[in-house]
Regions:
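Loop/turn elements at helix/coil->beta-strand transitions in domains of secreted/extracellular proteins
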Residues: 2-5, 34-39, 63-66, 113-116, ...
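Catalytic grooves of carbohydrate-active enzymes
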Residues: 5-23, 29-31, 165-272
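N-terminal catalytic cores of secreted or lumenal carbohydrate-active enzymes
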Residues: 25-43
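Alpha-helical scaffolding segments of alpha/beta enzyme cores, especially the outer helices
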Residues: 26-29, 56-57, 102-106, 129-136, ...
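Catalytic domains of carbohydrate-active enzymes that cleave complex glycans
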Residues: 34, 126, 142-144, 148-149, ...
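Metal-dependent polysaccharide deacetylase catalytic core of the NodB/CE4 family, i.e.
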Residues: 37-129, 150-153, 197-200, 265-272, ...
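Active-site-adjacent pocket scaffolds in enzyme catalytic domains
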Residues: 48-52, 76, 117-221
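Trp/Gly-enriched beta-strand/coil motifs that build multi-repeat beta-propeller-like domains
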Residues: 286-442
Length: 442
């Protein structure tokens, strides 16, 4: 029986309170003393603060663990969703690159860490623009995502490998007031998954409210450095939490159903896979799978629809093979052919020559004076590549694959969530995330 991969992940974020840094130290040392490496996802501003506060003890403790990124400024407005919810993708993307490059610089300067394997967005900041930016920055994994399956299979979306957060210790009352029975029941639930992330916010072991709920809810409530401290928990609650955290770690280590791992180990395993290549001998199998369903393929390799689109273009133009790379979906909703049409092989080849070789995909395509959708074009292209001289297409075909396996992305609606500002409208983010479904693959 395949073991469940279990990751211990820590949203290490409170840059407003030196007291909260004590919790980072405690949780890091609990794991180290049990022989387990955690993944501490650090906010860039907190990395600076740990240096400013002289917290060498915390920085030394973190060196045992994997260090990753939890954005530059977490909840400081405008947060990632607020500044990327604009029509101009290039402007949104560039600002993510600017801020998150600075975050990594701060994290590395403070901790001395090497490669960053995962980016964890704060709260509900699920921005397609950030996902593309992280991929292009060389960060291979995006965690606390809405683009994982309910079973924890993982998968690529916007060119990053997506892993869902599953069990948050500080969000479960039993970690503060319960004990072994509740912990064993939680492990039973996690063991049903292929992969599970157990996570904490270290500051919440000492405080009863999140630091950003008192300082950054909707607005930046105070000048930087003049923050409120969140209400503290009774000491006995904190102690019970730490006892239960240690117990959870021990029981997970002893449980043969689990294999404890890190984001880095998963990323290295994924990176070791051979290049994904669409070969001429694959075209008939691809055509048959696309006839069955407009959906990413798992054979002959892991291919997203954007991979297949670029490969079809290349093969129509005479290529023998196409090596897949980072791809993109759509900036606007793709539009189907409005009525049935017949396309010739020569028209398809001419249209391929006019298509861009990279970047976002076109929402509509002209083929011999007929306007069709990208899915219409994709299916017709593979028919031609398999020998057809003419291809009939239907009108009104669905242009996007089903997101039922990624139901959180399918149902995403970000307006009014988390600490977003009153002016945040979600004019683009939720829809554009769904329009990137052509980059989904497993």
């Amino acid at each position: 029986m395949e073991k469940t991969e279990l990751i211990f992940s820590f949203d290490t974020e409170d840059f407003t309170s030196n007291k909260a840094a004590d919790a980072i130290l405690t949780e890091a040392e609990i794991l180290r003393s049990e022989g387990v490496r955690g993944c501490f996802c650090l906010v860039g501003l907190l990395a600076d603060q740990l240096v400013n506060w002289g917290r060498k003890d915390v920085l030394d403790a973190l060196r045992y663990h994997e260090i990753d990124s939890h954005t530059l400024a977490h909840s400081v407005h405008p947060v990632i969703n607020e500044y990327t919810d604009i029509e101009n993708f290039d402007a949104a993307y560039s600002e993510v690159i600017r801020q998150e490059t600075e975050a990594i610089r701060k994290i590395r300067r403070a901790t001395g860490c090497g490669k960053i394997y995962v980016a964890v967005p704060p709260g509900d900041d699920k921005s397609y623009a950030a996902m593309y930016a992280y991929a292009d920055m060389g960060i291979p994994i995006y965690a606390d995502t809405v683009c994982d399956t309910p079973e924890g299979d993982g998968g690529w979306y916007c060119n990053v490998y997506n892993i869902e957060y599953v069990l948050g210790a500080d969000g479960e009352d039993f970690f503060f007031r319960g004990g072994e029975a509740e912990i064993r029941a939680a492990l039973d639930r996690l063991a049903r998954r292929k992969r599970a992330v157990f996570y904490t916010h270290p500051h919440m072991s000492l405080f009863s409210r999140h630091w950003d709920s008192v300082n950054y809810n909707k607005i930046n409530k105070h000048p930087f450095g003049e923050w409120e401290e969140a209400p503290r928990r009774p000491a006995e609650e904190s102690e019970r939490f730490y006892e239960n955290l240690r117990l959870f770690v021990r029981l997970a280590k002893e449980d043969p159903r689990f294999r404890i791992t890190t984001y880095g180990e998963i990323a290295e395993r994924l990176a070791a896979r051979p290049p994904r290549i669409v070969r001429k001998e694959d075209l008939r199998l691809i055509r048959e799978r696309l006839r069955e369903k407009l959906y990413p393929l798992t054979e002959p390799d892991s291919f997203c629809l954007s991979d297949l689109f670029r490969a079809a273009r290349a093969h129509l133009l005479g290529a023998e093979t196409w090596e897949c790379r980072n791809e993109r979906g759509f900036l606007y909703a793709p539009e189907a052919a409005k009525e049935p049409a017949v396309l010739t092989a020569e028209e398809l080849r001419r249209s391929a020559a006019a298509l861009p070789a990279s970047g976002f995909l076109p929402e509509r395509i002209d083929v011999g004076g007929k306007t069709i959708g990208p899915a219409d074009w994709l299916l017709a292209a593979y028919e031609v590549l398999c020998g057809a001289e003419t291809v009939g297409i239907e009108g009104g075909r669905e242009q996007l694959p089903s997101l039922d396996r990624l139901h959180l992305a399918r149902d995403l609606s970000l307006k009014g969530t988390w600490i977003h500002s009153y002016s945040f409208e979600d004019n683009w983010l939720s829809d554009r995330l769904r329009w990137q479904s052509w980059t989904m693959r497993f």
